[in-house]
Regions:
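Sec-dependent signal peptide cleavage junction
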Residues: 21-32, 214-222
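Beta-strand acidic-aromatic groove motif in beta-rich domains, primarily in extracellular
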Residues: 50-53, 90-92, 114-128, 159-161
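Secreted extracellular polysaccharide-interacting domains
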Residues: 79-105, 125-135, 164
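Extracellular carbohydrate recognition
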Residues: 142, 167-186
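C-terminal cell-surface addressing/anchoring modules of secreted/extracellular proteins
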Residues: 196-238
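Extra-cytoplasmic beta-strand recognition segments
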Residues: 39-41, 80, 90-120, 146-152, ...
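Extracellular glycan-recognition surfaces and repeat-rich motifs
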Residues: 42-79
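Extracellular carbohydrate recognition and processing domains
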Residues: 128-158, 171
């Protein structure tokens, strides 16, 4: 009886590892799905602007802000450009369907110049909440990669992302360019990264499941490997 059980251990371990590989493969495929439409701005509409994107600004004054498509691209043929001739908060924006109580990563490449380190410069951000990626101020010859991790609310089903020059109480002038943007669902932020709330907190925020989810991910970034160890131990009968 003992011999049979020992003989089964390698098979059980192999099956456990195959199951684990399946779990990680599914997670990897999920994380690779870009939820943005026309994220590289390659498809241009009749109005001369990228399909799937809208423009918006804090100050919509004639001659203050210009939105254009450029052939100076990180990849492909096009990128987008925002030029503020005076201090403004201007952006390309897109609303995307998301899942409640879930983690996401917004990322992309940014160039900026003539901003003089004022305001929030070129950045990626989320509508209606004060969260921003790293700001880019003076990078006319080099694309800089920026990213932002967030968590959705328990009943949240959409989010509006901004490719932005300026920000709330951080208006900027100058020029910023954006290319190869990405919004993907992730299992959790990387170790040491805290996901920001991509929603307006309520008075009952202490009991919010999304906040508990963010705290758990920040405290336990290595949960997949702990799961792997547990499966292996069970398979070996330890």
């Amino acid at each position: 009886m003992k011999r049979n059980r020992l003989a089964r251990r390698p098979l059980l371990l192999l099956l456990s590892l195959l199951m684990l590989l399946g779990i990680f493969s599914t997670a990897s495929a999920e994380e690779s799905t870009n939820l943005l439409q026309n994220p590289g701005f390659e498809e241009i509409g009749a109005d001369g602007l990228p399909v799937g994107w809208k423009t918006d600004a804090y100050l919509n004054l004639e001659g203050m802000t210009f939105y254009t498509v450029s052939d100076n691209a990180m990849s492909g043929a096009h990128s987008v450009q925002i030029e503020n001739l005076d201090h403004n908060d201007a952006r390309f924006c897109q609303t995307v369907a998301v899942e409640p109580s879930s983690f996401y990563r917004l990322s992309g490449y940014v160039k900026a110049w003539d901003t003089l380190d004022e305001g929030l410069g070129g950045n990626l951000s989320i509508k209606d909440v004060y969260v921003f990626s790293e700001s880019v101020y003076d990078s006319p010859d080099e694309w800089q990669y920026v990213e932002l991790y967030g968590v959705t609310d328990t009943d949240q089903h959409e989010v509006t992302v901004y490719a932005r020059l300026g920000g709330y109480s951080g208006e900027s002038f100058g020029t910023a360019m954006f290319d190869d943007l990405s919004l993907v669902k992730v299992d959790a932020p990387p170790e040491g990264i805290v996901a920001s709330r991509w929603y307006q907190p309520t008075a009952a925020v202490q009991d919010d499941t999304s906040d508990d989810l963010a705290d758990t991910a920040a405290a336990s970034p290595a949960w997949p490997w702990m799961t792997a160890v547990g499966i292996a131990y069970v398979a070996l009968g330890v």
